[in-house]
Regions:
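Structured, non-catalytic alpha/beta "coupling" segments that mediate domain-domain communication
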Residues: 85-87, 220
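Catalytic cores of Mg2+-dependent Asp-rich isoprenoid enzymes
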Residues: 1-80, 92-99, 117-126, 136-156, ...
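Acidic/His metal-coordination segments adjacent to aromatic residues that form catalytic metal sites
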Residues: 100-112
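Alpha-helical transmembrane segments of multipass membrane proteins
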Residues: 127-131
Length: 264
């Protein structure tokens, strides 16, 4: 039976919810809590009308991770898992820092953009791996790369939604080369000038996956942390559509097969 937090995760982050099902039963709730925490960090940027308000919400979560008890459906189990070592405070603080950089929204170069994804979506995959017992640096690096690839795919899939929110989290030097500002890119994510940029960013995501493949594979017990890469690989095979379809049976079967086989 799912916990209430698990039901919430299924509604708000169905991709990662599916991957949780392939974690050892004793550690599933830890992943559910970690991913629910990540969703709360994402909401801080999405629901706040001003950057200052988003930063205030992120500061609230920083205080939770640093040990301040607050009544909240995610904060309460999160604190318990930090206290008993199931989750690592350093990993969670790094995720908050990545979200703070997202609020700032300035990625001056492609390298800075990639570093942000490696810290954010990649850092979440590392935190999941550690929660599942991974300690090998090579395996953790592979998880970081796979998580970053999933982050690339997610941004490209969501670019219309991001535009409606007034956001264009793309490398500003590449936008400038197109004679575009971030504001213009947010106003019209379908502008033909952006097509080559998005294709290039998708190639960066595929590069993350290629680099991960030469690193040690995660053990079967930690395969759940790597499974978002299955979806990233499918999404990035071709540049994600401007209006992507909801996840279908093929996506779910691909994740299920990889989870049952224990390899990505």
């Amino acid at each position: 039976m799912l916990s209430p937090l698990g039901e919430t995760l299924r509604r708000h982050d169905p991709d990662r919810f599916l991957t949780v099902l392939f974690a050892p039963e004793a550690r599933r709730e830890t992943l559910v809590t970690l991913y629910a925490f990540n969703h709360e960090l994402a909401r801080a940027r999405e629901v706040a009308s001003q950057s200052l308000l988003a930063l205030m919400r992120l500061q609230w979560w920083r205080e939770v991770v640093e040990g301040e008890a607050k009544g909240h459906e995610v904060a309460t189990p999160l604190l318990a898992m930090l206290a008993d070592g199931r989750l690592d405070a350093g990993d969670l603080l790094a995720l908050i820092e990545a979200r703070e950089a997202e609020v700032d929204g300035d990625f001056p170069t492609l390298e800075a953009w990639c570093d942000w994804l490696l810290a954010g979506a990649g850092g979440l995959a590392v935190a999941a791996g550690r929660a599942l017992g991974v300690t090998d640096d090579g395996v953790l690096r592979g998880l970081r790369l796979r998580g970053a690839a999933y982050g690339v795919a997610g941004l490209l899939r969501a670019r219309l939604v991001l535009g409606r929110q007034g956001r264009a989290p793309w490398p500003t030097d590449h936008l400038a080369a197109l004679d575009m500002t971030a504001e213009a890119a947010a106003a019209d994510p379908t502008d033909a000038r952006l097509r080559d940029l998005f294709a290039h960013l998708a190639e960066e995501g595929r590069g993350f996956l290629a680099e991960a493949r030469v690193l040690p594979a995660p053990p079967r017990a930690a395969i759940a942390a790597a499974l978002p890469a299955v979806l990233a690989r499918r999404d990035l095979r071709h540049m994600p559509s401007v209006d992507p379809r909801p996840r279908g049976l093929g996506d779910r079967l691909a994740v299920t097969f990889a989870g049952l086989m224990g390899r990505v």
